């Protein structure tokens, strides 16, 4: 039972593989990012080993460590070994232990057999250890030597060793450096450059299960977003630039680009991060509210327009009331309440709250209470 994660982590990671196959890598990476964040959200999880020999209750094993963190660890293994060795190793593990029980050591032996690599270092810290790296990344440029030094400091108590990707952006081009971080407090890596790099970006694909603190200017976040090819760097750039929107031109440029991003989760995140008065973004928001192919994005865009309290959007809100999407319907009703409160009662009374989703109900409740729509209030 202590090795429960050997089963449950694959259940978690199978979802990643399905999302990757069915919906594409961006969607799979988004779900993985959210899954790992959910695991980290409970501070108790940091102190739990993945393989636990001491637990108070069998049911305690069904948690964000056995599932979410375990799935993230498998993803690291896949990327360290490569697809061919990883999946061949899994095949060997299944055949070798067919009709029997499985333990983490047996998984390690199969992966070592196929890959030819010693994986004790990996399993000792990730399967039989707790926590994850908490890093502080800083860089300094030496103009005389034409070198940049990247300092990676581990601030957690138990130190890890791991491979780490570092992107160096120079003259608009990314050079990816692959380094090995040893299990000590500080590691320095020196790279030859022609000038002070525009950006240093550690763990650009979010492959390493970690928390990384790295100060970046709005301009650097804009460069990170516009040069990144993966979801993680784009998504986190949007998140980190949020507080500078409408205050810094590079943050504004980043959000203007994100509202047009090909991946809908990035468009949605940008909409959610807009300030209360999004004047310079309204043209793009209107297009999303009218034409976006994803109802979640369309609904969020309508929600942004509702906050402007501009009556010119009333036809758009009234059209949205008839949408199938709960997001579009709920935000449209909120918009009507803002610009034409005399109409909101009539529209709200026609919505069937019994069959409505929880999200729609939560959106509508403030409108119902504020406007005293008695027909939708419980007796």
PLM regions and their residue ranges:
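Hydrophobic alpha-helical and helix-loop surface patches within well-folded domains
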Residues: 1-152
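Solenoid-repeat scaffolds in large eukaryotic assemblies
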Residues: 86, 344-345, 377
């Amino acid at each position: 039972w202590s090795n429960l994660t050997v089963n449950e982590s694959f259940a978690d990671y199978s979802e990643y593989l399905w999302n990757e196959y069915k919906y594409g890598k961006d969607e799979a990476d988004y779900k993985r990012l959210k899954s790992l964040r959910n695991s980290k959200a409970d501070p108790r999880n940091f102190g739990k080993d993945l393989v636990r020999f001491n637990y108070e209750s069998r049911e305690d094993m069904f948690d964000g460590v056995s599932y979410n963190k375990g799935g993230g660890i498998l993803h690291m293994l896949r990327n360290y070994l490569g697809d061919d060795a990883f999946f061949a190793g899994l095949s060997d593990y299944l055949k070798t232990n067919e009709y029997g029980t499985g333990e983490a050591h047996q998984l390690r032996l199969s992966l070592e057999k196929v890959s030819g690599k010693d994986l004790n270092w990996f399993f000792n810290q990730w399967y039989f250890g707790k926590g994850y790296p908490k890093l502080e990344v800083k860089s300094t440029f030496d103009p005389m030597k034409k070198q940049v030094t990247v300092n990676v400091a581990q601030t957690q108590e138990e130190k890890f060793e791991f491979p780490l990707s570092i992107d160096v952006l120079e003259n608009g081009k990314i050079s990816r450096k692959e380094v090995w971080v040893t299990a000590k407090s500080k590691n320095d890596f020196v790279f030859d450059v022609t000038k002070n790099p525009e950006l240093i970006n550690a763990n650009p694909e979010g492959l390493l299960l970690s928390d990384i603190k790295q100060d970046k200017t709005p301009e650097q976040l804009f460069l990170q977003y516009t040069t990144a090819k993966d979801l993680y760097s784009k998504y986190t750039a949007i998140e980190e630039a949020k507080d500078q929107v409408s205050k810094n031109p590079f943050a504004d440029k980043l959000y203007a680009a994100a509202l047009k991003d090909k991946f809908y989760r990035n468009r949605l995140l940008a909409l959610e991060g807009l300030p209360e008065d999004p004047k310079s973004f309204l043209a793009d928001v209107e297009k999303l509210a009218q034409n976006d192919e994803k109802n979640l994005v369309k609904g969020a865009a309508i929600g942004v327009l509702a906050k402007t309290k501009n009556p010119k959007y009333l036809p758009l809100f009234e059209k949205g009331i008839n949408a199938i999407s709960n997001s579009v319907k709920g935000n449209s009703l909120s918009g009507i309440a803002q610009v034409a409160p005399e109409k909101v009662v009539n529209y709200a009374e026609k919505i069937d709250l019994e069959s409505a989703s929880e999200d729609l109900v939560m959106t509508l409740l403030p409108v119902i209470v504020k406007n005293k729509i008695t027909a939708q209030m419980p007796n």
